[in-house]
């Protein structure tokens, strides 16, 4: 669901940072 997408985006953002 959306929660999964949001969590995925946060993980990707954390990796970029």
From Swiss-Prot:
Superkingdom of origin organism: Eukaryota
UniProt entry keywords in alphabetical sequence: Amidation, Secreted
GO cellular-component term (any): extracellular region
Residues annotated with Leucine amide modification: 17
Tissue-level expression: Expressed by the skin glands.
Compartment annotation: Secreted
Keyword hit for Secreted: yes
Protein name: Caerulein precursor fragment-related peptide BM5
Protein's organism: Xenopus boumbaensis (Mawa clawed frog)
